[in-house]
């Protein structure tokens, strides 16, 4: 139970455990260990990812959907109070957020697209790879909440083309 930041033996043992976990997560999703940041959970990860982009690109436009997890919706609504504009896409008749609906929402000031890979209530999958390709052609960052997908489908950050991705251990432990 040592502090992983401490120099004593218990701390160093804890540090090795954290770094081993970091390597395992990176290998599981095709990332490098330096790209893995641990948070207290999915809500903090979602919040940190979205707010970090918003801070780097003030007053930019964000695209998300009206059916995202509350952690994403709340963060985006908060950012509206700080001067960001947010488009909340509505799903189509099949419950999907389509690549075309995202493309139609893109503006010259769009800085982030924040969408989940698999909806936690409907199970509908979003084509994150195609959305990422569209976004990157326009210099837009992509954040994917993949909490529902992790452990249920093969996730690879390179195949998805995302810049930021959130996962949660409680779905796979």
Residue ranges and their predicted role:
Residues 1-173:
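Pyridoxal 5′-phosphate
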């Amino acid at each position: 139970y040592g502090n992983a930041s401490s120099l004593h033996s218990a701390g160093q043992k804890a540090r090795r455990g954290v770094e081993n976990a970091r390597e395992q997560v990176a290998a599981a999703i095709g990332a490098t260990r330096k790209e893995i940041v641990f948070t207290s959970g999915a809500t903090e990860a979602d919040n940190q990812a979205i707010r970090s982009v918003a801070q780097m690109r003030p007053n930019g436009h964000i695209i998300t959907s009206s059916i995202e997890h509350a952690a994403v919706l709340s963060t985006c609504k908060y950012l509206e109070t700080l001067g960001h504009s947010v488009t909340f896409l509505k799903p189509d008749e099949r419950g999907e957020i389509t690549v075309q609906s995202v493309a139609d929402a893109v503006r010259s000031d769009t800085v982030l697209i924040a969408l989940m890979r698999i909806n936690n209530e409907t199970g509908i999958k979003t084509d994150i790879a195609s959305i990422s390709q569209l976004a990157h052609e326009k210099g837009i960052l992509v954040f994917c909440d993949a909490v529902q997908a992790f452990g249920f489908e093969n996730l690879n950050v390179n195949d998805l083309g995302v810049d930021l991705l959130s996962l949660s251990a409680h779905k796979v432990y």
